Protein backbone atom coordinates (compact mmCIF):
# COMPACT_ATOMS: atom_id res chain seq x y z
CA UNK A 1 0.00 0.00 0.00
CA UNK A 2 1.01 3.65 -0.33
CA UNK A 3 2.28 5.31 2.83
CA UNK A 4 0.54 8.74 3.11
CA UNK A 5 2.99 11.34 4.33
CA UNK A 6 1.21 14.58 3.44
CA UNK A 7 -1.59 16.45 5.17
CA UNK A 8 -5.21 15.57 4.48
CA UNK A 9 -6.36 17.37 1.34
CA UNK A 10 -2.84 18.45 0.47
CA UNK A 11 -0.16 17.10 -1.81
CA UNK A 12 1.40 13.81 -0.75
CA UNK A 13 4.90 14.95 -1.65
CA UNK A 14 6.77 11.95 -0.26
CA UNK A 15 4.38 9.10 -1.05
CA UNK A 16 6.09 5.73 -1.11
CA UNK A 17 5.24 2.06 -1.13
CA UNK A 18 5.27 0.01 2.06
CA UNK A 19 6.38 -3.60 2.42
CA UNK A 20 3.58 -6.16 2.17
CA UNK A 21 2.48 -8.61 4.85
CA UNK A 22 0.52 -11.31 3.04
CA UNK A 23 -2.40 -13.15 4.56
CA UNK A 24 -1.28 -16.37 6.27
CA UNK A 25 -0.86 -19.20 3.78
CA UNK A 26 -2.25 -22.57 4.77
CA UNK A 27 -0.04 -25.41 3.65
CA UNK A 28 0.25 -29.14 3.94
CA UNK A 29 3.65 -30.76 4.44
CA UNK A 30 4.11 -34.42 3.58
CA UNK A 31 7.17 -36.61 4.10
CA UNK A 32 8.13 -40.13 3.15
CA UNK A 33 8.50 -40.85 6.87
CA UNK A 34 8.11 -39.00 10.15
CA UNK A 35 11.87 -38.33 10.13
CA UNK A 36 11.66 -36.98 6.58
CA UNK A 37 8.68 -34.78 7.54
CA UNK A 38 10.62 -33.31 10.44
CA UNK A 39 13.62 -32.67 8.17
CA UNK A 40 11.42 -30.81 5.65
CA UNK A 41 9.94 -28.58 8.37
CA UNK A 42 13.42 -27.82 9.72
CA UNK A 43 14.70 -27.07 6.20
CA UNK A 44 11.89 -24.56 5.65
CA UNK A 45 12.56 -22.92 9.03
CA UNK A 46 16.28 -22.72 8.15
CA UNK A 47 15.40 -20.95 4.90
CA UNK A 48 13.22 -18.42 6.74
CA UNK A 49 16.02 -17.82 9.25
CA UNK A 50 18.35 -17.09 6.32
CA UNK A 51 15.88 -14.43 5.16
CA UNK A 52 15.91 -12.87 8.65
CA UNK A 53 19.72 -12.83 8.76
CA UNK A 54 19.86 -11.23 5.34
CA UNK A 55 17.76 -8.30 6.55
CA UNK A 56 19.51 -7.93 9.89
CA UNK A 57 23.14 -8.41 8.88
CA UNK A 58 23.00 -7.89 5.09
CA UNK A 59 24.85 -11.17 4.60
CA UNK A 60 24.03 -14.36 2.78
CA UNK A 61 21.77 -14.86 -0.22
CA UNK A 62 18.38 -13.24 -0.62
CA UNK A 63 15.38 -15.50 -0.08
CA UNK A 64 12.37 -15.17 -2.39
CA UNK A 65 8.82 -16.37 -2.68
CA UNK A 66 7.98 -17.12 -6.32
CA UNK A 67 4.74 -16.83 -8.27
CA UNK A 68 3.66 -18.07 -11.68
CA UNK A 69 0.08 -17.40 -12.72
CA UNK A 70 -1.92 -19.89 -14.72
CA UNK A 71 -1.24 -19.35 -18.42
CA UNK A 72 1.77 -17.08 -17.87
CA UNK A 73 5.21 -18.03 -19.18
CA UNK A 74 7.24 -15.90 -16.77
CA UNK A 75 7.93 -16.57 -13.11
CA UNK A 76 7.97 -13.66 -10.66
CA UNK A 77 9.62 -13.32 -7.27
CA UNK A 78 9.41 -11.11 -4.18
CA UNK A 79 12.11 -11.00 -1.53
CA UNK A 80 11.10 -12.32 1.89
CA UNK A 81 11.94 -9.84 4.66
CA UNK A 82 10.49 -11.70 7.65
CA UNK A 83 8.54 -14.92 8.03
CA UNK A 84 7.26 -17.40 10.58
CA UNK A 85 6.09 -20.98 10.19
CA UNK A 86 3.41 -22.14 12.65
CA UNK A 87 1.85 -25.55 13.04
CA UNK A 88 -1.94 -25.27 13.18
CA UNK A 89 -4.07 -26.62 16.02
CA UNK A 90 -4.19 -30.42 16.10
CA UNK A 91 -1.42 -30.53 13.49
CA UNK A 92 0.18 -33.48 15.24
CA UNK A 93 -2.92 -35.61 14.67
CA UNK A 94 -1.56 -36.31 11.18
CA UNK A 95 1.99 -36.91 12.38
CA UNK A 96 1.75 -40.74 12.46
CA UNK A 97 1.01 -40.63 8.71
CA UNK A 98 4.09 -38.42 8.06
CA UNK A 99 2.00 -35.34 7.29
CA UNK A 100 1.01 -32.11 9.00
CA UNK A 101 -0.67 -28.76 8.42
CA UNK A 102 1.06 -25.40 8.90
CA UNK A 103 0.53 -21.68 8.46
CA UNK A 104 3.18 -19.50 6.79
CA UNK A 105 3.24 -15.77 7.65
CA UNK A 106 5.36 -13.64 5.28
CA UNK A 107 6.39 -10.00 5.07
CA UNK A 108 7.93 -9.31 1.65
CA UNK A 109 8.95 -6.54 -0.71
CA UNK A 110 6.08 -4.47 -2.06
CA UNK A 111 6.79 -5.58 -5.64
CA UNK A 112 7.20 -8.70 -7.75
CA UNK A 113 10.08 -8.83 -10.21
CA UNK A 114 10.76 -11.26 -13.01
CA UNK A 115 13.22 -14.06 -12.27
CA UNK A 116 14.72 -13.51 -15.74
CA UNK A 117 16.00 -10.24 -17.16
CA UNK A 118 14.61 -8.30 -20.11
CA UNK A 119 16.73 -6.37 -22.60
CA UNK A 120 16.18 -2.62 -22.79
CA UNK A 121 18.99 -2.09 -25.31
CA UNK A 122 21.23 -4.70 -26.89
CA UNK A 123 24.90 -3.82 -27.35
CA UNK A 124 25.04 -0.34 -28.89
CA UNK A 125 28.11 1.78 -29.59
CA UNK A 126 28.16 5.33 -28.24
CA UNK A 127 30.91 7.94 -28.36
CA UNK A 128 32.23 9.90 -25.38
CA UNK A 129 30.90 13.25 -26.65
CA UNK A 130 27.51 14.68 -27.61
CA UNK A 131 26.69 11.26 -29.14
CA UNK A 132 26.74 9.61 -25.70
CA UNK A 133 22.99 8.96 -25.50
CA UNK A 134 20.90 5.79 -25.71
CA UNK A 135 17.13 5.85 -26.21
CA UNK A 136 15.29 3.13 -24.28
CA UNK A 137 11.60 2.64 -25.02
CA UNK A 138 9.11 -0.13 -24.26
CA UNK A 139 10.29 -0.84 -20.72
CA UNK A 140 8.13 -3.66 -19.37
CA UNK A 141 6.42 -3.74 -16.00
CA UNK A 142 4.46 -1.28 -13.90
CA UNK A 143 6.91 0.53 -11.59
CA UNK A 144 10.49 1.80 -12.02
CA UNK A 145 13.19 -0.85 -11.88
CA UNK A 146 16.99 -0.65 -11.46
CA UNK A 147 19.08 -0.79 -14.63
CA UNK A 148 21.75 -3.44 -15.18
CA UNK A 149 24.56 -1.89 -17.23
CA UNK A 150 27.30 -3.65 -19.19
CA UNK A 151 29.75 -1.04 -20.53
CA UNK A 152 32.54 -2.36 -22.79
CA UNK A 153 35.74 -0.82 -24.14
CA UNK A 154 35.56 -0.57 -27.94
CA UNK A 155 38.79 1.26 -28.77
CA UNK A 156 41.15 -1.45 -30.02
CA UNK A 157 43.45 -1.18 -26.98
CA UNK A 158 43.38 -1.30 -23.19
CA UNK A 159 42.22 1.99 -21.64
CA UNK A 160 42.60 3.06 -18.01
CA UNK A 161 39.06 4.40 -17.68
CA UNK A 162 38.58 6.05 -14.29
CA UNK A 163 35.23 7.83 -13.67
CA UNK A 164 31.95 6.77 -15.26
CA UNK A 165 29.02 9.19 -14.97
CA UNK A 166 25.63 7.78 -16.03
CA UNK A 167 22.30 9.59 -16.00
CA UNK A 168 18.76 8.88 -17.19
CA UNK A 169 16.49 11.63 -18.52
CA UNK A 170 12.83 10.65 -18.31
CA UNK A 171 11.19 13.99 -17.49
CA UNK A 172 12.82 16.66 -19.63
CA UNK A 173 12.91 15.19 -23.14
CA UNK A 174 16.10 16.80 -24.38
CA UNK A 175 16.55 16.25 -28.11
CA UNK A 176 19.72 16.15 -30.17
CA UNK A 177 22.49 17.86 -28.23
CA UNK A 178 20.25 19.93 -25.92
CA UNK A 179 21.82 18.18 -22.92
CA UNK A 180 25.11 19.88 -23.87
CA UNK A 181 25.88 23.56 -23.26
CA UNK A 182 28.79 25.05 -25.20
CA UNK A 183 31.90 26.29 -23.41
CA UNK A 184 34.75 28.52 -24.56
CA UNK A 185 38.42 29.43 -24.12
CA UNK A 186 40.09 31.92 -21.77
CA UNK A 187 43.81 32.72 -21.81
CA UNK A 188 45.43 34.58 -18.95
CA UNK A 189 48.94 35.99 -18.90
CA UNK A 190 48.97 37.07 -15.28
CA UNK A 191 47.46 35.75 -12.06
CA UNK A 192 43.66 35.68 -11.88
CA UNK A 193 42.42 37.32 -8.73
CA UNK A 194 39.63 35.96 -6.57
CA UNK A 195 36.26 35.21 -8.23
CA UNK A 196 37.07 36.49 -11.72
CA UNK A 197 34.42 35.40 -14.22
CA UNK A 198 36.31 33.90 -17.14
CA UNK A 199 33.94 31.78 -19.27
CA UNK A 200 30.23 32.06 -20.01
CA UNK A 201 27.97 29.16 -21.09
CA UNK A 202 24.40 30.06 -22.07
CA UNK A 203 21.39 27.81 -21.43
CA UNK A 204 18.69 28.83 -23.89
CA UNK A 205 15.14 29.62 -22.83
CA UNK A 206 13.98 26.50 -24.70
CA UNK A 207 16.31 24.22 -22.74
CA UNK A 208 15.64 26.04 -19.45
CA UNK A 209 11.90 25.52 -19.96
CA UNK A 210 12.49 21.78 -20.50
CA UNK A 211 14.56 21.69 -17.30
CA UNK A 212 11.41 22.93 -15.51
CA UNK A 213 13.04 23.43 -12.12
CA UNK A 214 14.60 19.97 -12.08
CA UNK A 215 17.94 19.17 -10.47
CA UNK A 216 21.01 18.38 -12.55
CA UNK A 217 24.61 17.36 -12.07
CA UNK A 218 26.64 19.84 -14.10
CA UNK A 219 29.52 17.92 -15.70
CA UNK A 220 32.22 20.07 -17.27
CA UNK A 221 34.45 18.69 -20.02
CA UNK A 222 37.74 20.54 -20.51
CA UNK A 223 40.43 20.19 -23.13
CA UNK A 224 42.65 22.41 -20.96
CA UNK A 225 42.41 22.97 -17.20
CA UNK A 226 45.79 23.63 -15.56
CA UNK A 227 46.49 22.02 -12.20
CA UNK A 228 46.58 24.16 -9.08
CA UNK A 229 43.88 26.68 -9.96
CA UNK A 230 40.55 27.09 -8.17
CA UNK A 231 37.39 26.96 -10.28
CA UNK A 232 33.67 27.15 -9.58
CA UNK A 233 30.47 27.61 -11.56
CA UNK A 234 27.98 30.44 -10.99
CA UNK A 235 24.48 30.81 -12.38
CA UNK A 236 23.14 34.11 -13.72
CA UNK A 237 19.86 35.14 -15.32
CA UNK A 238 20.15 37.27 -18.44
CA UNK A 239 18.06 39.10 -21.04
CA UNK A 240 19.74 39.40 -24.41
CA UNK A 241 23.42 39.68 -23.59
CA UNK A 242 23.06 41.49 -20.26
CA UNK A 243 23.31 39.56 -16.98
CA UNK A 244 20.73 40.72 -14.46
CA UNK A 245 21.60 38.87 -11.27
CA UNK A 246 23.54 35.96 -9.85
CA UNK A 247 21.11 33.22 -8.85
CA UNK A 248 23.36 30.54 -7.39
CA UNK A 249 26.93 29.36 -7.12
CA UNK A 250 28.54 25.98 -6.68
CA UNK A 251 31.47 24.57 -4.70
CA UNK A 252 35.00 25.76 -5.35
CA UNK A 253 37.14 22.96 -6.77
CA UNK A 254 40.92 22.71 -6.80
CA UNK A 255 42.02 21.45 -10.19
CA UNK A 256 44.47 18.56 -10.29
CA UNK A 257 44.61 18.76 -14.07
CA UNK A 258 41.54 16.57 -14.56
CA UNK A 259 39.50 17.33 -17.66
CA UNK A 260 36.08 16.04 -16.57
CA UNK A 261 34.68 17.80 -13.49
CA UNK A 262 31.43 17.35 -11.58
CA UNK A 263 30.40 20.86 -10.51
CA UNK A 264 27.66 19.54 -8.24
CA UNK A 265 23.85 19.63 -8.34
CA UNK A 266 21.92 22.64 -9.64
CA UNK A 267 18.24 23.47 -9.87
CA UNK A 268 17.51 24.84 -13.34
CA UNK A 269 15.93 27.34 -13.35
CA UNK A 270 16.41 28.13 -9.65
CA UNK A 271 13.15 28.21 -7.71
CA UNK A 272 11.47 25.96 -10.25
CA UNK A 273 10.08 28.89 -12.22
CA UNK A 274 9.49 28.79 -15.94
CA UNK A 275 12.25 30.72 -17.62
CA UNK A 276 11.10 34.09 -18.92
CA UNK A 277 14.66 34.60 -20.10
CA UNK A 278 17.80 32.56 -20.59
CA UNK A 279 20.32 31.69 -17.92
CA UNK A 280 24.10 31.59 -18.02
CA UNK A 281 26.72 29.57 -16.23
CA UNK A 282 29.93 31.47 -15.57
CA UNK A 283 33.17 29.73 -14.71
CA UNK A 284 35.12 31.73 -12.15
CA UNK A 285 38.74 31.01 -11.40
CA UNK A 286 41.65 31.89 -9.15
CA UNK A 287 45.13 31.24 -10.56
CA UNK A 288 48.64 32.18 -9.55
CA UNK A 289 50.31 32.22 -12.96
CA UNK A 290 49.53 32.25 -16.66
CA UNK A 291 47.75 29.64 -18.73
CA UNK A 292 44.71 28.71 -20.79
CA UNK A 293 41.35 27.29 -19.74
CA UNK A 294 39.30 25.64 -22.46
CA UNK A 295 35.85 24.41 -21.47
CA UNK A 296 34.47 22.20 -24.24
CA UNK A 297 30.99 21.75 -22.78
CA UNK A 298 28.74 21.53 -19.73
CA UNK A 299 26.45 18.49 -19.68
CA UNK A 300 23.05 18.69 -17.98
CA UNK A 301 22.73 15.29 -16.29
CA UNK A 302 19.49 14.67 -14.32
CA UNK A 303 20.33 14.19 -10.64
CA UNK A 304 17.38 11.96 -9.71
CA UNK A 305 18.75 9.04 -11.73
CA UNK A 306 22.50 9.63 -11.59
CA UNK A 307 25.22 7.04 -11.10
CA UNK A 308 28.94 7.58 -10.47
CA UNK A 309 31.28 4.58 -10.76
CA UNK A 310 35.03 4.75 -10.11
CA UNK A 311 37.73 2.42 -11.43
CA UNK A 312 40.63 2.38 -8.97
CA UNK A 313 43.44 1.13 -11.18
CA UNK A 314 42.49 -1.50 -13.77
CA UNK A 315 43.44 -1.04 -17.44
CA UNK A 316 40.25 -2.26 -19.09
CA UNK A 317 41.20 -4.41 -22.10
CA UNK A 318 39.59 -4.02 -25.48
CA UNK A 319 36.29 -5.88 -25.20
CA UNK A 320 36.45 -5.83 -21.41
CA UNK A 321 34.37 -3.49 -19.35
CA UNK A 322 32.36 -2.57 -16.29
CA UNK A 323 29.15 -4.18 -15.04
CA UNK A 324 26.71 -2.50 -12.65
CA UNK A 325 23.68 -4.36 -11.28
CA UNK A 326 21.35 -1.79 -9.77
CA UNK A 327 19.17 -4.44 -8.17
CA UNK A 328 21.95 -5.97 -6.10
CA UNK A 329 24.17 -2.84 -5.97
CA UNK A 330 27.10 -4.91 -7.29
CA UNK A 331 29.78 -3.43 -9.53
CA UNK A 332 32.91 -5.00 -10.99
CA UNK A 333 35.21 -4.89 -13.99
CA UNK A 334 35.23 -7.83 -16.36
CA UNK A 335 37.53 -9.29 -19.01
CA UNK A 336 36.68 -9.48 -22.72
CA UNK A 337 35.58 -13.11 -22.52
CA UNK A 338 33.31 -12.37 -19.53
CA UNK A 339 35.00 -15.22 -17.65
CA UNK A 340 36.73 -13.21 -14.91
CA UNK A 341 35.47 -10.48 -12.59
CA UNK A 342 37.74 -8.02 -10.78
CA UNK A 343 37.03 -5.98 -7.65
CA UNK A 344 38.55 -2.79 -9.04
CA UNK A 345 35.32 -0.79 -9.22
CA UNK A 346 33.77 1.42 -6.55
CA UNK A 347 30.19 2.66 -6.36
CA UNK A 348 30.61 6.35 -5.55
CA UNK A 349 27.03 7.62 -5.65
CA UNK A 350 23.50 7.11 -6.85
CA UNK A 351 21.78 4.68 -9.17
CA UNK A 352 19.74 4.59 -12.37
CA UNK A 353 16.16 3.37 -12.71
CA UNK A 354 14.26 2.60 -15.90
CA UNK A 355 10.64 3.78 -16.17
CA UNK A 356 7.81 1.87 -17.92
CA UNK A 357 5.57 3.94 -20.15
CA UNK A 358 8.21 6.62 -20.70
CA UNK A 359 11.07 7.30 -23.08
CA UNK A 360 14.31 6.80 -21.16
CA UNK A 361 17.39 8.67 -22.42
CA UNK A 362 20.56 7.23 -20.92
CA UNK A 363 23.80 9.27 -20.94
CA UNK A 364 27.27 7.82 -20.33
CA UNK A 365 30.37 9.98 -19.89
CA UNK A 366 33.85 8.89 -18.74
CA UNK A 367 37.43 10.01 -18.24
CA UNK A 368 40.76 8.21 -17.82
CA UNK A 369 43.31 7.55 -15.10
CA UNK A 370 45.57 10.46 -15.94
CA UNK A 371 42.59 12.81 -15.67
CA UNK A 372 42.28 12.98 -19.45
CA UNK A 373 38.92 13.38 -21.14
CA UNK A 374 38.97 11.98 -24.69
CA UNK A 375 35.84 12.70 -26.70
CA UNK A 376 36.55 10.05 -29.36
CA UNK A 377 36.46 7.06 -27.01
CA UNK A 378 33.83 4.49 -27.92
CA UNK A 379 31.82 2.33 -25.55
CA UNK A 380 29.52 -0.61 -26.27
CA UNK A 381 26.61 -0.43 -23.83
CA UNK A 382 24.05 -3.15 -23.06
CA UNK A 383 21.13 -2.37 -20.76
CA UNK A 384 19.01 -5.07 -19.12
CA UNK A 385 16.60 -5.09 -16.17
CA UNK A 386 14.06 -7.15 -14.25
CA UNK A 387 10.50 -5.90 -14.92
CA UNK A 388 8.60 -5.11 -11.72
CA UNK A 389 4.89 -5.05 -10.92
CA UNK A 390 2.78 -4.61 -7.80
CA UNK A 391 0.25 -7.43 -8.04
CA UNK A 392 -0.49 -9.63 -11.06
Regions found by a protein language model. Give the residues of each.
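Exposed aromatic-hydrophobic patches
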Residues: 134-137, 201-205, 219, 258-270, ...
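Extracellular/virion structural assembly segments
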Residues: 1-169, 222, 226, 251, ...
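Extra-cytoplasmic beta-strand recognition segments
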Residues: 170, 201-237, 298, 364
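Extended extracellular/luminal ectodomain segments enriched in beta-structured repeat modules
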Residues: 20-22, 141-146, 207-219, 228-230, ...
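Short beta-strands within extracellular/lumenal beta-sheet-rich domains
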Residues: 127-140, 183-216
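Short, surface-exposed beta-strand/strand-loop-strand elements in extracellular ectodomains
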Residues: 161-164, 231-241
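Extracellular carbohydrate recognition and processing domains
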Residues: 240-275
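Extracellular beta-strand ligand-recognition surfaces/modules
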Residues: 142-148, 262-298
